[in-house]
Amino acid sequence: MADERTSDSVKTRYDIALMKLNDIKIAVFRDSLSTYVEQKTGLTIQFNWPKSRCLVISTLCKIPFPTKSAAELQEMCSLLLCCPERLQLLGYVSVWGEETRDVCLTKTLVFAGEDEKFYGLDFVNETLYLLAETTERFAVLGLRRYDPVYREKDIRFLTKIDDVLQSLIDAQDNLWKFATIVYKNSGRHYIMKSCLENNDGVFVLFLTRKEDFPSRMEWNFFSDVYESMPYDGQVIGSIGKTLLYPKTMFVMMDLSGAIYGIDTIGTGIGSCVKIADDFESFLRQGIVRGYRRYKFFHRNINTVQEILPLCPHTSLGPTFSNNYIYDLSSEDDE
């Protein structure tokens, strides 16, 4: 009965969001979005995920936090995006509630692009995220592709937080303290839910030290893993489908606390890819960024382990079936 109520709740949010987003789609196609935004300023659209967030339609002058000028925002987006595309401001992300318009930890602006695409801009850190390629997909996904949302404290974790994980979260800014806790709890494992992928994984904690390996061959394998890491860092565990196959991806942390993944499926060692900003975000986000990326950013020495997404103007991701929304159970509904 509880599962049925959850499915009904998700479907209702999806239907309402899609209805309102379709009005935006029509305005874009009629080249009248600016008029729509002016007339609908203050309108809220609750996201399917997370349900605690909403899109507030707003003109730039009525956004309740300091931003940049329209020209500066347009220039930033054009420099970040892979191809020229006209982006028009829709509004900003806020906390959902009848009485509140509190803004979130990350100041996020939402833009409508061409051909039904939607983007989220973290203008403080100058990063742009492709939120969805179509109106229907935006209604389904909400902010799932927007990495900064996983830093918000009210977003639920993918696994139950026990004393060990809490101590690791508290020590995430100190790699050596973090590594000591991992070493003391080596072999401890956690089921990490993956609502979007419908593919739960097992996160196993372990610390790699040379004296722990029975053979030189196995240590040489891990030496290859370490050579793939960006800076001084430490393997802290792995994620796999089951305990029998626990090493689908090695999980690492660097000195700054960022989390990386190295894919081990197939032959050899895959490239090292940043998958989360810190351990706490990783426990909310999982390893999905090791395989799918939607973040556009400036290339520099600090982003060498990040991979730009596929160009959305020439290729689209997987399409969703009509029954997809019924299978999508948000963890914040549990």
Curated annotation (Swiss-Prot):
<comment type="function">
    <text>Isoform 3 can transactivate the human immunodeficiency virus type 1 promoter.</text>
</comment>
<dbReference type="InterPro" id="IPR003360">
    <property type="entry name" value="US22-like"/>
</dbReference>
<dbReference type="Pfam" id="PF02393">
    <property type="entry name" value="US22"/>
</dbReference>
<keyword id="KW-0805">Transcription regulation</keyword>
<comment type="similarity">
    <text>Belongs to the herpesviridae US22 family.</text>
</comment>
<keyword id="KW-0010">Activator</keyword>
<keyword id="KW-0804">Transcription</keyword>
<protein>
    <recommendedName>
        <fullName>Protein U17/U16</fullName>
    </recommendedName>
</protein>
